[in-house]
Structures are given as structure tokens and as C-alpha cells.
């Protein structure tokens, strides 16, 4: 059993309620994560067990996912947001929001409360919202690293720990860090002596 613990930063991106029985808000928290108070970490920790069907199916292979319709909506929305940022044309903003709202309206608890559409006017705010929505939707599916590369390889720090009581390890990728580049597989280097390994 190999659980992953989502960061507080990620969980804070979801608009959900664990106490309001009439409106749970963003249902992805319930569909994607397992709420476990029995793990040897802090109480009531959200965890993801990909191999047991939480977040992404019952695959024993992490990040072994096909393309989902949600990803296609997000990919197209990203193009529209970037075009809106580049040109300032409101039509691209409208198209981006249409894709984002189409995705989101199917992720919220609408039994007693109608989904409220997002309407963001500022290009930079829309870009930020888009990135957060992609992170909410595609968490633990193997997209994040590639997304960060596409966003310009920003500086990133993560805290790692094995269990309570042990020292934490902080790993940092600097902006534009060479570790954002995958190494060329050894089999490819063996077959072509003219290839040079990526610097890491």
C-alpha cells in the first residue's frame, strides 16, 4: 500500500464542505481522495491510494491514465486563456470560461444549490485560476511536472517525510533547474553515440 498525502496547498484549492450535508461543494475531494484518521500522521489526513481505485482507477501503475474529456476541456481552455493574454480579445476569454465552467458544473454538488459560473475579467487572474483548476482536476495523474515545465519551470519546494517523528527533507528545484529536463534513456544513448546526455 503506497499512499500519497496531498499538500495542504492542494487541498486548499478545493471549495468543499465536510460538514454541510446539503451542499458538499466540490465533489472531487470525495471522489479523488480517501479521508483516513487511522494513519500514523496527523489526524483526519486526506490520502490518495492510486492502486486501490482512489483517484484514477484501479491500476497498479501510477500515472497510467488515458486522456480524459476533462483534460481536453482544460487543454482547449489553456489555449484560449493564452490567446486572451496575448491579444486581449474578449472572445477568447469567453471561450476559456465556457470550457472551465462546463467542466466545473459537473464537479459540484447541485442537489440543493445551483452551480455558480466563474466570470473572471482580468487575464492574469484567469491564467492563475486556470492553473489551479487544472491542478484540482488532474492531481496525481502525472501531469503536474509537465505542466510546471510548460509554465516556465518556476522554483518549487517540497517537504518530504516518512513518518511522524522523523526529520523532514526539503527538496527545491530552482527556476529553470536542469532537473526539469528528463534524462535521455541509456538504451537510446547506447544506440546513438552522437547523442549527448541532458545535463541535470
Placement of each model-derived feature along the sequence:
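Active-site-proximal, Lys/Arg-enriched surface segment
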Residues: 14
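Acidic/polar-rich alpha-helix caps and helix-coil junctions
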Residues: 1, 6, 18-200
